[in-house]
Each structure stands twice: as structure tokens, then as C-alpha cells.
Design a protein with these regions (language model features):
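Conserved SAM-binding strand-loop segment of SAM-dependent methyltransferases
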Residues: 124-134
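Conserved SAM/SAH-binding beta-strand->alpha-helix loop
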Residues: 113
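Short alpha-helix
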Residues: 203-221
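Conserved class I S-adenosyl-L-methionine
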Residues: 83-92
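Conserved beta-strand signature within the Rossmann-like core of class I S-adenosyl-L-methionine
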Residues: 172-180
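S-adenosyl-L-methionine
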Residues: 1-81
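A short glycine-rich, Lys/Arg-flanked "PGG" loop and its adjoining helix->strand segment in the class I
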Residues: 159-171
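A short SAM/SAH-binding and catalytic strip from SAM-dependent methyltransferases
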Residues: 142-159
Length: 259
């Protein structure tokens, strides 16, 4: 994600509509329908004590226009590493699913946002509305999982997310992940917000740079097979090992956390 930004002066709280569900009934859905921002993820400050409700913190811009455009050069480098069938977790408006489908690579997008699923289908891709922590189509048979555009933060606990994704690919399957461009390792509470201060409800999120990502991935049994940067973005390629013994050790190590 880009550097923190500042919003214009906000309207009075009494003038704002009631916050909707994250990603489904908030400014994100409107931005996907129009293909335009500005849109932000606002970091919420934790409460100082039990009587403090916390407050508003820095803004992290969300690159809606890029998500709604055709794949760029950095995206294309990722797509060239895909072995079908491909599952795009948090597919957003579906640029990657649509591009793979156009090349004849079987691909499916998964997203909790109805607007994201609808836009993916409009672009000619297949998508289902579902959480990654729910039962997914074709579990254990996907050749590649994509986790792009900051979606490593889904659920707020990357250890749990990466452990879950190991169950979605077979031994030898791969995971292509976009890490934060900076060396960060944080768990936070955020909300999606537009330039007018309209926002959805808070939800847990996480941000990991490549170093923290690799430590977390190793802890749940993924093996590093590639790492690169392109157009200011950072990417990692991981594989689920083919060794059954390695899988058993990883399962034992990640058994304490549940989504």
C-alpha cells in the first residue's frame, strides 16, 4: 500500500449515514461499481483505557483505479507464474481472473463483496461470494492460489490465513503472495473510508512485509521458491511441500490457531 494520506475536512458525525458491513455495504462497493476512488483504509487507534473508545489514525490509500484496470506489468509477471487451475482469494473487481480466463487458464475468484463478484463476472471471469475460511469449491485441487493487493491481511491473522490456504492446494501447489512494500509486521483494526468521511464498520487487518511474511509462511509449512520486486511492489512465491512428513510437522505447528 502507498504512504499514509490526509483527507479533506469531514462532515459532522450527525450528517453521516450509519456504517455498513465491511467490503459489502460501505464505500468499497461504490468504488468498485464506478471504478474510481479515492478510497482509503483508515487505521483506528486502539483505546488507551477501558473508558476510551479509541480514535481515528492514519490513512492507507487503496488503489481502486489499478484494481479496476487491466493487469499491469507487475501483475503480468505474477500471472506468468500461475499453474492452473487458479484461485484468486479476495479477487476484487477481477482483473487477474479475467486475464487468466482470456488466456484459457481455469480460474475462479473468491470475495465477500457482492460488487466484486459482479464486476468479475462482467469482465468474463468466474467468481463466488464466499469467505476464504468457508468451504471453497475444489478444495485441495487448486494448482495456484493468488493473494494479491494486500489480501494477506484478510482476517487480521496471517498465520491462520496461510495455514488455511495450505489446505486448499495439493502437495506441490503454489501460493503467490504480494507483501507490503515496506518492512512491516503489524496487526491492526481498520475501516474503509472515502474522501467525504463515509465509512463502513471496523474490522481486523494485517500488514506484512516480505521478511515477516516468510517467517510466518515457514511456521505453517510453506517453502520459499521465489521472491522479487516489480514496479515498487513486492512478491513471494511459496510451495506446499510434497513430503508427507513435512506436512505433518507443519500441521502440528499450526494447530493452536483457528479462523
Amino acid at each position: 500500500m502507498a504512504r499514509p494520506a490526509r483527507l479533506p475536512a469531514q462532515s459532522h458525525p450527525a450528517d453521516r449515514p450509519r456504517p455498513g458491513e465491511p467490503w459489502t455495504d460501505d464505500p468499497y462497493a461504490h468504488a468498485l461499481r464506478t471504478g474510481r476512488g479515492p478510497l482509503f483504509m483508515r487505521r483506528l487507534r486502539p483505546p488507551v483505557d477501558r473508558d476510551d473508545a479509541g480514535g481515528e489514525g492514519e490513512l492507507l490509500p487503496l488503489d481502486v483505479e489499478r484494481w479496476c484496470a487491466a493487469p499491469d506489468a507487475a501483475d503480468t509477471g505474477v500471472l506468468q507464474r500461475c499453474a492452473g487451475p487458479v484461485l484468486d482469494v479476495g479477487c476484487g473487481p477481477g482483473r487477474l481472473v479475467a486475464a487468466l480466463t482470456a488466456e484459457g487458464v481455469p480460474a475462479l475468484g473468491v470475495d465477500v463483496s457482492p460488487a466484486a463478484v459482479a464486476r468479475t463476472r462482467q469482465r468474463g471471469g468466474a467468481a463466488v461470494r464466499r469467505s476464504v475460511f468457508d468451504r471453497l469449491p475444489g478444495e485441495g485441487r487448486w494448482g495456484t492460489i493468488l493473494l494479491m493487493d494486500g489480501n494477506l491481511g484478510i482476517g487480521g491473522d496471517p498465520l491462520v490465513l496461510l495455514a488455511r490456504l495450505r489446505t486448499v492446494v495439493p502437495p506441490g501447489g503454489r501460493l503467490l503472495v504480494e507483501a507490503a512494500p515496506h518492512d512491516v509486521d503489524e496487526r491492526l483494526t481498520v475501516r474503509v473510508e472515502d474522501a467525504h468521511g463515509r465509512h463502513g464498520r471496523p474490522f481486523p487487518w494485517a500488514r506484512l512485509g516480505a521478511t515477516a511474511l516468510l517467517h510466518t509462511a515457514e511456521a505453517v509449512g510453506w517453502i520459499l521458491t521465489g521472491r522479487w520486486a516489480d514496479e515498487g511492489r513486492s512478491f513471494v512465491e511459496l510451495h506446499r511441500p510434497r513430503s508427507r512428513q513435512h506436512d505433518e510437522r507443519a500441521s502440528a505447528g499450526g494447530r493452536t490457531e483457528q479462523p
